[in-house]
From Swiss-Prot:
Its main location: membrane. It comes from Bos taurus. Interacts with TMEM67. InterPro entries: Tmem218. Keywords: Cell projection, Membrane, Transmembrane, Transmembrane helix. This is Transmembrane protein 218. It is a multi-pass membrane protein. Coiled coil: none annotated. May be involved in ciliary biogenesis or function. Belongs to the TMEM218 family. PANTHER family: TRANSMEMBRANE PROTEIN 218 (PTHR31622:SF1).
């Protein structure tokens, strides 16, 4: 399914854009005075006609085209393992430093007498 976004084709987005623009135009024309207020009917009917034309004359066929067998190739194979090795080394170094800091934490002597 080439040319799809979120599983739907471009026609759905064209229809959504058409109806959003028509609704905004109708909202603006409702505030108009005089004869411009009645042009909302023509805008709405025009949108209905364009929608009917777009729905009745689809571009693609009903049967999907046979898909060619895809070969999966991992192009970033070496880089992924270099990154994994680097992150492992950083993790082990950090763990070593934390344990050393924990083991070598200074313990201060308490004074026997306080005057």
């Amino acid at each position: 399914m080439a040319g799809t976004v979120l599983g739907v084709g471009a026609g759905v987005f064209v229809l959504a854009l058409l109806w959003v623009s028509v609704l905004l135009l109708c909202a603006l024309l409702f505030r108009a005075s005089g004869a411009a207020r009645f042009s909302v009917i023509f805008v709405f009917l025009g949108a209905l006609i364009v929608t009917a034309i777009l729905l009745l004359f689809p571009r693609a066929s009903d049967a999907p085209a046979p898909e060619a067998e895809t070969k999966i190739v991992d192009a970033f194979f070496i880089g992924r393992y270099v990154l994994l090795a680097f992150l492992t080394a950083v993790f082990l170094g950090s763990l070593f430093l934390v344990l050393i800091h924990h083991i070598l934490e200074p313990i201060y002597a308490k004074p026997l007498r306080s005057y």
